[in-house]
């Protein structure tokens, strides 16, 4: 299967299935000398692991990471880093009946059309558990960014149509509720709404917003490797994501150029902007301002409510999906968005090291 590799210089390859022996990732292109231990990675994996509240899948997994290669005496060696997480509580029998029909909203039908075969247990390769490898690799990328003074923060901006109030925005509150929302009142409203949908076997979606601070200027390229285009590709590669916008996004289509243009001014001896409608990217290249983008996350397709579908014999049938599923994926997808953002930024930052001859000469000057 092609399409499991992401990145050009800081490159990752994820592997594994939801109900296989395990999942993981191989990272190639990480510099030697980065302090790294399993705890650094585990902290991020713990943010996405299942079973943390009644609003996520009840499947319980420790998701304990094992570093198999690329680290010696607490530092990266510059060789490929291999990370593995072993599945422990898979219940494949829950999925035996879906082998013969296509679940609405899932990749069952398209997998069969493309490969002529599919691992129906929990979605196989298209399961949300595939993101374990992304988050594990993203933890390493975030350590690199931290060394450069760059910080990534994502949160649930909206769930089930209930949005946060920016006047009540408190990022510390994000970790105090089950929804990763930085607004306590909004989280309480989501709780009530989610419970009402769960009671009838339905699910809900939402919007994740991500902010990058400390970003230097000049990262990205003007054509096919644009910073915003690469971010869009990275975020849209997350299974549940169906939309992406950066800066003012689609709202920019409703205003004039006079309003949309970010006017330049001098700030503390450097070029700055009066506004940030662009979301920190101009011409595919970072402008030094905060990078702000949003991702639309669809409702979890696995629901127990009765739905119409088709089986492999071409017959119309009605189904109710069994198994352990998330009534919403937004809260657990927040850390995945952060991880894919980190991977994109590190890859482009490393790419930028050869953009200017004067800097190449400065680097190698003895």
Curated annotation (Swiss-Prot):
Its EC number is 4.2.3.5. FMN binds at residues 125-127, 283, 298-302, 324. Keywords: Amino-acid biosynthesis, Aromatic amino acid biosynthesis, FAD, Flavoprotein, FMN, Lyase, NADP. GO terms for biological process: amino acid biosynthetic process; aromatic amino acid family biosynthetic process; chorismate biosynthetic process. It is an enzyme of class 4 (lyase). NADP(+) binds at residue 48. InterPro entries: Chorismate_synth (IPR000453), Chorismate_synth_AroC_sf (IPR035904), Chorismate_synthase_CS (IPR020541). Reduced FMN (FMNH(2)). Its cofactor is FMNH2. The keyword NADP applies. GO terms for molecular function: chorismate synthase activity; FMN binding. One of its GO terms (cellular component) is cytosol. Pathway: Metabolic intermediate biosynthesis; chorismate biosynthesis; chorismate from D-erythrose 4-phosphate and phosphoenolpyruvate: step 7/7. It catalyses: 5-O-(1-carboxyvinyl)-3-phosphoshikimate = chorismate + phosphate. NCBIfam families: aroC, PRK05382.1. HAMAP family: Chorismate_synth. Belongs to the chorismate synthase family. Homotetramer. This reaction introduces a second double bond into the aromatic ring system. This is Chorismate synthase. It comes from Lachnospira eligens (strain ATCC 27750 / DSM 3376 / VPI C15-48 / C15-B4). The gene is aroC.
């Amino acid at each position: 299967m092609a399409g499991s590799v992401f990145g050009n210089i800081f490159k990752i390859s994820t592997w594994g299935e939801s109900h296989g022996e395990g999942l993981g990732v191989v990272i190639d292109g990480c510099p030697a000398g980065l302090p790294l231990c399993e705890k650094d990675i585990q902290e991020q994996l713990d943010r996405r692991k299942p079973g943390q509240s009644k609003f996520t899948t009840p499947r319980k997994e420790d998701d304990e990471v094992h570093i198999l290669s690329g680290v010696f005496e607490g530092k990266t060696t510059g060789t490929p880093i291999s990370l593995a997480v072993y599945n422990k509580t898979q219940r494949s029998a829950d999925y035996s009946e879906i082998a013969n029909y296509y679940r609405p909203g899932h990749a069952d039908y398209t997998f069969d059309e493309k490969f002529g075969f599919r691992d129906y247990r929990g979605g196989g390769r298209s399961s949300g558990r595939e993101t374990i490898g992304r988050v594990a690799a993203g933890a390493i990328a975030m350590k690199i960014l931290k060394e450069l003074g760059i910080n990534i923060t994502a949160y649930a901006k909206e769930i089930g149509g209930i949005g946060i109030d920016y006047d009540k925005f408190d990022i510390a509150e994000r970790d105090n509720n089950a929804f990763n929302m930085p607004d306590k009142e909004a989280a309480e409203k989501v709780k009530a709404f989610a419970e009402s949908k769960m009671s009838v076997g339905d699910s809900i979606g939402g919007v994740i917003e991500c902010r990058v601070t400390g970003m230097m200027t000049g990262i990205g390229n003007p054509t096919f490797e644009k910073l915003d285009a690469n971010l869009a590709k990275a975020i849209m590669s997350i299974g549940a994501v169906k939309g992406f916008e950066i800066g003012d996004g689609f709202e920019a289509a409703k205003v004039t150029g006079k309003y949309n243009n970010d006017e330049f001014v001098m700030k503390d001896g450097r070029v700055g902007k009066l506004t940030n409608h662009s979301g920190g990217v101009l011409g595919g290249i970072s402008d030094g301002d905060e990078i702000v983008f949003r991702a639309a996350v669809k409702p979890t397709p696995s629901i127990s409510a009765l739905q119409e579908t088709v089986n492999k014999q071409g017959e119309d049938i009605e189904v109710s999906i069994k198994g352990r599923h998330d009534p919403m994926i937004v809260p657990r997808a927040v850390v995945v968005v952060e991880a894919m953002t980190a991977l994109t930024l590190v890859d482009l930052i490393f790419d930028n090291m050869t953009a200017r001859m004067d800097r190449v000469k400065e680097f190698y000057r003895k």
